[in-house]
């Protein structure tokens, strides 16, 4: 099954996440099919907190990709804002 989830980047104590389309069997930070955007939980001031390619997100959802709980919440919150 294909899933849309976060993969961690950044350094120790300074997390940064990429929204990736990946096979659900691969490791969290392992191989991925496509990168759809990023999430920066420690963004300050004018820094961008979330960026998502909505066109590609809708494409992958149409192909049957399942979003993780956290990604679904981020997308929902971004749409409301």
Swiss-Prot record:
Superkingdom of origin organism: Bacteria
GO MF annotations, alphabetized: structural constituent of ribosome
Family the entry assigns: Belongs to the bacterial ribosomal protein bS16 family.
Keywords: Ribonucleoprotein, Ribosomal protein
NCBIfam families in UniProt: S16
SUPFAM superfamilies (UniProt xref): Ribosomal protein S16
GO terms (BP aspect): translation
Gene source species: Teredinibacter turnerae (strain ATCC 39867 / T7901)
InterPro entries: Ribosomal_bS16, Ribosomal_bS16_dom_sf
Stated name of the protein: Small ribosomal subunit protein bS16
GO CC terms of this entry: cytoplasm; small ribosomal subunit
UniProt xrefs under PANTHER family: 30S RIBOSOMAL PROTEIN S16, SMALL RIBOSOMAL SUBUNIT PROTEIN BS16M
Pfam families in UniProt: Ribosomal_S16 (PF00886)
């Amino acid at each position: 099954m294909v899933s849309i989830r976060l993969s961690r980047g950044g350094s120790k104590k300074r997390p940064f996440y990429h929204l990736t389309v990946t096979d659900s069997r691969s490791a969290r930070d392992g191989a991925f099919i496509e990168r759809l955007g990023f999430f920066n939980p420690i963004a300050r001031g004018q820094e961008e907190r979330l960026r998502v390619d909505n066109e590609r997100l809708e494409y992958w959802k149409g192909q049957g990709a399942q979003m993780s709980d956290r990604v679904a919440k981020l997308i929902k919150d971004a749409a409301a804002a």
